[in-house]
Swiss-Prot record:
This protein's name: P2Y purinoceptor 4
Extracellular side: 1-30, 92-108, 171-192, 266-283
Topology of this chain in the membrane: Multi-pass membrane protein
Region (Disordered): 1-20
Organism of origin: Rattus norvegicus (Rat)
Location in or out of the cell: Cell membrane
Cytoplasmic side: 59-68, 128-149, 219-242, 306-361
GO biological process: cellular response to prostaglandin E stimulus; G protein-coupled receptor signaling pathway; regulation of presynaptic cytosolic calcium ion concentration; regulation of synaptic vesicle exocytosis; transepithelial chloride transport
UniProt cross-references to InterPro entries, sorted A to Z: GPCR_Rhodpsn, GPCR_Rhodpsn_7TM, P2Y4
UniProt xrefs under PANTHER family: P2Y PURINOCEPTOR 4, PURINOCEPTOR-RELATED G-PROTEIN COUPLED RECEPTOR
Amino acid sequence: MTSAESLLFTSLGPSPSSGDGDCRFNEEFKFILLPMSYAVVFVLGLALNAPTLWLFLFRLRPWDATATYMFHLALSDTLYVLSLPTLVYYYAARNHWPFGTGLCKFVRFLFYWNLYCSVLFLTCISVHRYLGICHPLRAIRWGRPRFASLLCLGVWLVVAGCLVPNLFFVTTNANGTTILCHDTTLPEEFDHYVYFSSAVMVLLFGLPFLITLVCYGLMARRLYRPLPGAGQSSSRLRSLRTIAVVLTVFAVCFVPFHITRTIYYQARLLQADCHVLNIVNVVYKVTRPLASANSCLDPVLYLFTGDKYRNQLQQLCRGSKPKPRTAASSLALVTLHEESISRWADTHQDSTFSAYEGDRL
């Protein structure tokens, strides 16, 4: 057994082999795949999210509810990508972590903090869209920017609170001259970590994903009704774009990662056949960069669904100055919402899409 193989086996946890208890992994692919993947996510994520934060802070105020959710989504993505250089070094150095236990805990914590904050912020956007399309009067009440800000603060705190045990599970472990930064925990604590991780997954991924699917199913049923008017067609197109982008992020980033991670954890707990466990391990490691890629895909949501964001981004790329805000444009959101209430009261049905017209980035 080579030293590299011994190191990889030590990091596994409970011995998965049903024979002599020695199941060695050949993870050479990981030392190429993960550094390259995380480096790409770092460059693209920072290049896409840093200008987004600047636009939200200096060119897109005042925010409506959707802009509030998207700002916090971009902030979460930016914080995460800033931690990726340490992981690039760690995997390029073949599982050697020289940065101390505290930073190991923080980087692993930040991965899941970003992951589940992103899930919940996308769920907030989905519910907000659903209310604007299917229940416009409730959208006026619950879609206020102040309520959205409080909800975002709650998301940050709830996710952080749920992940506090992760700070105790994750640790470093010396193996000769190499120091491991566990992405789970020590072998003797692995079964407890799986129970904790499964509970967090159900609460912060399973339930929000179910809510998102229900909202978009109800939205799709309403959106495919025939509607007159160009403005309503524009609103419908924007909503369909939102559905497409959010479901793509879930399908590409979140769902594969959680499925393969669950299979991998259970295979280790049940001490599956070594050959099976090797295959599961490879598939799981491949989906980890996909989970990080949501930091690059989220900006597509702002670009496809936000007219104001798209216009300001074009001005920023051209180096032109923003146009001065007029009183009429400052009051546009209020006027359009008031108009939507009037239309809804008159028709009780088809103008529900207009209630969302003012909610443009």
